[in-house]
Amino acid sequence: MKKYKIIYADPPWRYARSKVQGAAEKHYPTMSIEELCALPVKEIADKDCILFLWATFPQLKEALQLIKAWGFTYKSVAFVWLKQNRKSPTWFYGLGFWTRGNAEICLLATKGHPKRQSNKVHQFIISPVEQHSKKPDITREKILALMGDLPRIELFARQHTPGWDVWGNEIKSDKRFAGKEV
């Protein structure tokens, strides 16, 4: 099985409050934390690998649990996406659970000793929201600038990106992973 030095993932988190407006379940199938933890990500991670994992603040505890289950150690927040509205440069605000949410975070975790290639990559991503849960394309560019042109895969991918292997239920996957095309 091919090993990757970069794993980029935007899991389809299942929320306890699935009836709220904008709930992920209305847009795509979600997975429980147990289902996510059971994915054999350890099998595709190189001995020196970096994981970029999108998480929302209500799922932060589960994201840290998932990082550990996949064999990684949490290090930092790689990126903070400050969301703008689609049609104007004003800030986008979701309903939120307590306060009106805007930012989403991409956590950084490592296995072994991956090496950073650049110290010039900034944490903030200021970009409009697009389709539900789609992350800014510039994230992949920032990952490559930070880590270099290494073997990489995007889990739960929605699109094909040159140079990236992909796995997800919304696209034709390149590989087999967890008994499914990847």
Q: Could you tell me what each predicted segment is?
A:
Residues 1-182:
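Class I S-adenosyl-L-methionine-dependent methyltransferase catalytic core
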